[in-house]
Amino acid sequence: SKMDGQVIHCKAAVAWEAKKPLSLEEIEVAPPKAHEVRMKVLATAVCHTDAYTLSGVDPEGSFPVVLGHEGAGIVESVGEGVTKFKPGDSVIPLYIPQCGECKFCLNPKTNLCQKIRVTQGKGMMPDGTSRLTCRGKSLYHFMGASTFSEYAVVADISLCRVAPEAPPDRVCLLGCGVSTGYGAPLNTAKVEPGSTCAIFGLGAVGLAAIMGCRVAGASRIIAIDRNPDKFEKARIFGATDCVVPDASDKPISQVLGEMTDGGLDYTFECVGNVGIMRAALESCHKGWGVSVILGVAGGGQEISTRPFQLVTGRTWKGAAFGGWKSVESVPKLVDDYMAGKIMVDEFVSHSLPFDSINEAFDLMHAGKSIRTVLQL
């Protein structure tokens, strides 16, 4: 393209410091180096993880930074040695890459590729430098993506090619929240038909976990949230029962135990609250219940329960990105969406122009949105 090998000047939302609104700026995006791809971002969504880092409690948070990791767009140019992508390809950036050769990628039990983990955690490209600058200052990258910008540079292992007819303002959600929730029952818990399941927290991840339980054939899916306004949506995704946790004096584990003859086969924590993680484990059935942690708790927080809970046959697990090996799985999830097998549109509660990005954060903090998609 005419921009090939050139610095691109474009609009981005910059987080100059923690706890402050994002600032719309013109930034410079350098061309991709070896094994990097520069993409034009067409749509991006706002996730709680972006807010978590902006809030200042993320131990890996660095500023100034371009946040955003749920995005979709097209390849603008590729660096040297890139063979799997060409300009014009429809792509989704992946915050968990899949290099295909590290010991994690070679192990079928995990999706946690470690090839670029260290530099990604420091907000850098794999060579330890940044491609983003603003007003003479270098900006950090975020989660290997930085989609709150008209252009982004990502490692070629942190990207997948998807069907060109897939709408970017929908499939961007498969880059994080929807895939995270949907995969946990299928890949991590391996929910069997007829199982009973409970989902704690009815944000995008919780709703997607409900959908995963339904697809797995669960007979009962109990949705739990303090905000009963979330229940209507939960039923659309497949919840059979909805419970407000503090509606009774009894602990929620007792309420659920009475509803299910002793507890759930599977529970999913989609909040990121260590107290709820404990309740989710203790709501599992003795002898075989499994609880999966999906929520991200604040840095330094610890989970606790009595060892007897595990000695008597409960299992505590966790998952990142729903256990999906990213490069091979996300294109299939996009195909499933295009074929009507999984719901994605129903997660989009708001669509806003990119300039209204701070409003998207406000909607999320107020509990008024599931996902707000920003059109670039």
UniProtKB/Swiss-Prot annotation:
The keyword Glycoprotein does not apply. Its EC number is 1.1.1.1, 1.1.1.-, 1.1.1.284. The modification N-acetylserine is found at residue 1. Keywords: Acetylation, Cytoplasm, Metal-binding, NAD, Oxidoreductase, Zinc. One of its GO terms (biological process) is formaldehyde catabolic process. Binds 2 Zn(2+) ions per subunit. It is found in: Cytoplasm. The record marks 117 as: Important for FDH activity and activation by fatty acids. Transmembrane segments: none annotated. One of its GO terms (cellular component) is cytosol. Its main location: cytoplasm. Belongs to the zinc-containing alcohol dehydrogenase family. Class-III subfamily. Class-III ADH is remarkably ineffective in oxidizing ethanol, but it readily catalyzes the oxidation of long-chain primary alcohols and the oxidation of S-(hydroxymethyl) glutathione. Also acts as a S-nitroso-glutathione reductase by catalyzing the NADH-dependent reduction of S-nitrosoglutathione, thereby regulating protein S-nitrosylation. This is Alcohol dehydrogenase class-3. It comes from Myxine glutinosa.
